[in-house]
Amino acid sequence: MIYFFLKKIKMKLVSWNLNGIRAVEKKGLSEILEYINADIIGFQETKAQDDQVKEALKNVAGYHIYSSSAVKKGYSGTAILSKKEPIKVTYGLGIEEHDQEGRLICAEYEHFFYITTYVPNSGSGLHRLEYRSKWDSDLLNFIKNKEKEKPVFLCGDLNVAHKPIDLKNPKSNFNKTPGYTQTEID
């Protein structure tokens, strides 16, 4: 259904975990984005403050840029690049506990919402599992509220490998790698 919806409105949506926007910028980010030529691009793990994101994207033409950075410098962060200016852009889930890490941006368009998110990792030994579970529940509520208005495209790094195909070396990583434990999969 989503595919047909996108074909009808003729848009190309992209999601990309950068693992550091400044490093990718040095490797030709603007040329890559020009080649991709997407209407909306969601970045995760920018690992930069908002001004650094804008600086890294200074050679990228034709996009409105929205960035959300973590209070902790060099950590997490998300961004949206959009050829068309959204009706409205919101940052975070509206819950202070979650909104310190720059993990979500929601752009509202005429016919849909586009959300880019970098979901918290449960951490080694699952030390952040309780926080992660709360985040997941709050994110689901956020999405359900948006869906009451119009369709939602959730894009990003969800930090979970639900099936063995989602991870390199699934047998040796099962129950050892954050995001690929039975507790998280359930």
Describe the predicted segments one by one:
Residues 2-59, 64, 70, 75-76, ...:
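N-terminal, active-site-proximal structural segment of metallo-dependent hydrolase catalytic domains
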Residues 21-25, 99, 131-139, 180-183:
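Soluble or luminal CAZymes and related metallo-dependent hydrolases
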Residues 46-47, 52-122:
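Structured beta-strand-rich core segments of catalytic domains in phosphoester-bond hydrolases
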Residues 40, 61-64, 135-186:
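Metal-dependent phosphoesterases centered on the DNase I-like endonuclease/exonuclease/phosphatase
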